[in-house]
Amino acid sequence: MAQSTEARSQAPRLGAWAEGSSVRWRVWAPGHKGVDVVLYDAEDRVLRKVPLTPEADGCFGGALPDLAEGTRYKLSVDGGDPFPDPWSRSQPQGVHGPSEVVGSDHGWTDSHWKGPDPQALVIYEVHVGTATPEGTFEAFIPKLAHLRELGVNTLELLPVASFPGARNWGYDGVDLFAPQATYGGPRGLRRLIDAAHAHGIAVLIDAVYNHFGPDGNYLRAYSPHYFTGKHHTPWGDAVNYDSEGSRFVRSLVLSNVEMWIRDYHADGLRLDAAHAIVDDGQPHLLAEIVERAHAASASGRRVVVIAEDERNERKLVTPASEGGYGLDGVWADDLHHQLRRAFAGDHEGYYQDYTGSAEDLAATLRQGWFYTGQKSRNLGHARGTDPKGLGPWHFVHCIQNHDQVGNRPFGNRLSEDVSPAAYRAMSTLLLMSPFTPLLFMGQEWNARTPFLYFTDHNAELGKLVTEGRRKEFAGFSRFKGEEVPDPQARDTFTRSTLDWGELDNAEAAGVHTLYKELLRLRATEPVLTSRQGTHDARALGPDAFVLERRAEGDTLLIVVNLKGSLMHTLNPRASAGIVMWSENPRYGGTVAASPLTGNVLHLDGPSAAVVKLRE
C-alpha cells in the first residue's frame, strides 16, 4: 500500500554528527536487539565499544562525550562483525574501512552565486579520476579556466560517492554520503565546487539511486528492507522505495539529495538510469527528489535535476502541477544513435532501431527524440511518447558521453570511427541546435585517449567482472578476434587518463577553435539565445538535411551534408550570409573559400555550414 505524502516527507536524521563536545549517532536497524558503536584510533585499533539506546521506528541512538570531528568508528549489529555506517559522511580508508565523523564547515566564497539557468546549460561531463594525472577534485580546479574560456557553464561529475578501490566509474557506489577518498574526500569536493562558482560554472552531481554496488555493500546487515523482491533490476533486487520499511530507504535518498545541494553547494543532480528507479507509490520518488532539491537550495539559488532515462517519457519533464515529475531535463540519446548510424555505420544492438537517414535525422531534430511510440525492433515493444509542446532545453543531446565511449569494448572515442570532417559536422550540429548540449571531457579538441571500463574490486568479484565484460561483446561481429581489456588491470585505468597535452597539436587546436567559436555564437547570436525562437528540420534529399532556427525576424540555417555533393538554393527573397562552415581551414578543414555563392550553398562530403537569412 502506498504511504502517505506526510509519512514519506519525514526525513529522519541518521549517521553520526558532532554536537558541541560530543558526537551523536542514530542508526536504523529494525528487528535487531542492539547496535554498538566501535571506536578506532588512527592505526585502526579498537579503542572501545559503546552500546546505543533503542529508539522508535527500529532506530538506535546516543551521544558520546569528549569526541569531535575526525572520530573514526564502525557499527556492530547484535554483537556481529563491525561494519561501516551506511549513512557515513566520510570513508577515508575506503568502503570497507572505518567511517569518519565530519562536519560541513567550509569557508565558502560563493555568496554571489545564483545557480544555473536550466534553459541555457552547456554541460561538460567529467570523470574525476581520469580527468587529470592526479585524479583528484583539486587537481581539476586549474582546468576550470579552460572550461570558462571554451564556453561551458555546467560541470557534471560522474558519481563521486565512495566506491570500492581506487579505480571505478562510480556507478558501483555504496556510501552515498561520503565523497570518494582517493578523489580528495569532502574537503576536496567543496573546494572544487567553490572554485567552479568563482569561474561562473555550475556543478551537477551524478547520483545513483537505482541500485547499490556489491563490493562494500553492508546494507543487509542493518535491515533487509533496503531491498525488495517486489521489483527487479539488471542489478538484482530493486531498492525498496514502495514496500515495508521504505520510509527510511526513501529518506536515505532524499537526505542525500539535500546534502549535495545544501552542504556541498552543488547546483543539481544527474539521476542515473531513472527508468530503473521503480516506485509504485505516490508521489513517485523522482518527483520528491525534485521537490527536495529545490527546497534544499539557498534562497534564490537555482538548481536543476536531469535524468538519464531510456523511455523517451515526457512525464519526466512535465511540471508537477500538470501531473509530471518536474525534472528540468532528460537525456535523449536518439540523435546520438542516428548520427553514429549515419557517419560510423553502427547497426548492431540498439543501433538496429535507427537508419541514420536524412529524413530520420530531421525528424529527431524536430521532436527532440525519434521514438514517440513506435515499436522498437531491439526492445520488441513500443517506445516513447509524443514530446509536442516541450521546450527544447529539456532534451540533453550529445555525440559522446561516458556510456557511449566507455561501453564500447575498447573505449574508442568518436574520432576512431568517423573522419575528422564528420566529427566537425556532428559537432556543429550539436552546438547549433536548440537542445541542451553535453560534451564528454576532451571532446572539444577531439581527444584520442580512450575511456575504458575499469574497476578495482576484490579478486573474486573482479574475476567475474572481467569474464562478464568479455562475454558481453562476444556476439558483436566487429569485435570478434580481439580481446577486450581487463577492467581490473591498472593499465586499463591509466590508458583512460585524459592527455591535455594533445591541445598543443595543430589538428586538436583546430577542433578546439571550432568549439570555442560555436559556443561563442550560441551565447551571443540573438536567433540562438531568444526564448521565443522556433525551430524546424527537413531533409534536403537522401544525404543532407537542414535545421532552421527562427527568432527576431531572422533565420539561421544549419545545413549538414552526410556524404556526396550538395548544391542547395536558398530562399531567393532573402539575403543570405555565411556565418561559419565546418571545413574552414582554421578548424582543420580544407575549404578556404566560402561555400555560399549568392544564394547557392555548395557542400562536399561530411560537412556543415551555418547561414543567416534576412528577408
For the regions a language model picked out, list residue spans one by one:
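Conserved alpha/beta catalytic core and glycan-binding cleft of carbohydrate-active enzymes
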Residues: 286, 290-478, 558
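Short, flexible loop/turn elements at secondary-structure junctions
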Residues: 56, 66, 127-132, 161, ...
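Extended hydrophobic-aromatic, low-complexity segments
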Residues: 219, 250-251, 264, 408, ...
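Substrate-binding/active-site clefts of carbohydrate-active enzymes
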Residues: 111-118, 127-300, 304, 315-316
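Beta-sheet entry/capping signal
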Residues: 26, 153-154, 200-202, 267-268, ...
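A glycine-rich, aromatic-flanked flexible loop/lid motif
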Residues: 258, 262-265, 395-401, 483-492
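Generic enzyme active-site microenvironment
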Residues: 123, 204, 270, 306-307, ...
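Carbohydrate-interacting/catalytic domains
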Residues: 1-124, 133, 138-151, 410-412, ...
